[in-house]
Regions:
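An acidic, low-aromatic, low-complexity terminal/linker signal
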Residues: 1-179
Length: 179
């Protein structure tokens, strides 16, 4: 093994210290064949797919807005945001409503996912640091870590970092445009 492989790896030489802070319950879901998780405390509710009103002139990953009990909530298509094809509506497609801080603002948004799997309790020993992509220009700052559960690999997302501050502003603009 190359000696430089773990040079900046927080997991070397011992255990990854941040794993204990990440241990807890995660809502897991699928996008395509990949499995992701977000901290359960960020999840407000899960709703079935409903009519999403398109907002003109917004980024393609902003699917639109929904009326959730009188409140206008922007909806992000995570598949598109992550460079996949748009989410197709199936019986398992849902919107996970989350609350997070982005760019210093509290934001409620919906994230469109292919399927919710389970609430998964994770221990520190099951969580590894985000993968290093070497010198490749890959923005993986939104990945908290990678969990190993049974034979599955789950990318743990920092939902507050999936969007940049400017993208959050665009979301807020989409939200107020339809209010």
């Amino acid at each position: 093994m190359n000696a430089d492989v773990h040079k900046n790896d927080p997991a070397s030489p011992g255990t990854w210290e941040a794993a204990s802070a990440l241990a807890g319950k995660f809502m897991t879901f699928k996008l395509g064949n990949e499995e992701y998780g977000i901290e359960i405390l960020k999840v407000r509710e899960i709703i079935g797919l409903m009519e999403i009103t398109r907002v003109p002139r917004v980024t393609p990953w902003i699917r639109g807005v929904i009326n959730l009990r009188g409140k206008v909530v922007p909806v992000v298509d995570l598949r598109v945001k992550f460079g996949m094809s748009p989410t197709a509506a199936t019986e398992q497609t849902v919107i996970i409503v989350v609350q997070c801080a982005i760019g210093g603002r509290e934001l409620t948004m919906g994230i469109l996912v292919d399927q919710v799997l389970e609430v998964l309790p994770l221990e520190a020993s099951q969580i590894e640091p985000p993968p290093s992509f070497g010198t490749a220009e890959v923005d993986a700052g939104f990945i908290l870590g990678v969990a190993k559960a049974e034979k599955r690999v789950i990318f743990l997302l920092d939902i507050g970092k999936v969007l940049s501050a400017s993208e959050a502003l665009e979301m807020a603009t989409a939200q107020t445009a339809q209010a």
